[in-house]
């Protein structure tokens, strides 16, 4: 066991009093685990590394855990020849990510603003695809694919379909950042001299292709997609924003934090999207810019939590120095994503083999988002009869965090701290097999994968054992009642 649990155990002696089983002395045990303030390394949430795994990220301090590796690649890199996915490349990245204890999220890009480094495949022009010339601002001439051209569009839609056939539901694939359209796949062609955004119908077909190809893996739409944000979230997508922290870096009279994000969500009817699908943040510039400009970290982080973010991507840039920065980051990362606290657990101290064991537990999500994966709460008995795992009927995806009113007039002036979610009471009636050998059993709790009962989520309590379970009590199994 990594840490001997310091549990406040209240044993109320209720022998033959509280509906005790005939012939079996029982106490009602109430366990109150000790909460931890540790930053937890949990799947599908938290700090993202950028184009490198956490093992390769020299700017990742040891006190920040990371379970997600984020990257973006050009269409041409992922389909170097017509009809040929770069599976060797993607499989290698997935394997490196898995070895680092992370999952992978990525975006596909078609339009590059870097001269002589296009994102579209070199073969696209050779097969008759229409390529257009433009400039990014006052820069040199660039080639970008015309997604409104039927040949280009059909080739790209087929690429997305095959990408999903190969990788949808891959255990190491965390989510897809729905890209393809606009500069860098960011759904805009700002400062393009000659090439506008593709037609609305083309954009819709690209969104449909991603949502059809990736039905098991979550898909996130960039918040700047405007009409396509509305369209995507109505069909199950989450959303992503790539300029968290902009408090005036582009204009003294306008910024993303006060004048765009909340308003865009309202317009797209996406305010409650977080309840069913994830929200991802990427920093505008990186956090060093925020500190150098004197922008409030507390404001930015409270805002990100209030909009129920699950991820933060600082592009693997160096962090700003100073103990006050670390303190704010620690406070933020303790809350980012889901965070489950077991507040109390009640059970009787003894039960007959072949009988029913009732466990009542109270849980609270003190994070900023739900867990979107179908992991399940389970209990483990370990004793003379070996190991027995008993699943709960609870759906942990319904354990919601607290909320604040983001439309309150004062929210954009000073976002308040996100409150914890409401406590959730779970009552499980577990059937004990009649053949289970009598004796004293350790009772452990965990949140596990349904297919193999392996614990996957760290709880915000102390006392996790080496196997990932949390042994918190004991129960005596008596021989089967005659």
Where in this protein do the model-derived segments appear?
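Sec/Tat signal peptide C-region and signal peptidase I cleavage site
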Residues: 21-25
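Extracellular/luminal regions of secreted and cell-surface proteins that mediate adhesion/ECM remodeling
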Residues: 333-482
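An active-site-proximal structural segment forming one wall of the substrate-binding cleft
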Residues: 93-98, 130-177, 202-209
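Bacterial N-terminal signal peptides that target proteins for export
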Residues: 2-11
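Substrate-binding cleft/loops of secretory-pathway carbohydrate-active enzymes
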Residues: 182-208, 213, 220-270
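Bacterial N-terminal signal peptides
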Residues: 10-20
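N-terminal substrate-binding region of glycoside hydrolase catalytic domains
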Residues: 27-151, 270-324
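Non-catalytic accessory regions flanking glycosidase/transglycosidase catalytic cores in CAZymes
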Residues: 26-70, 75-99, 103, 152, ...
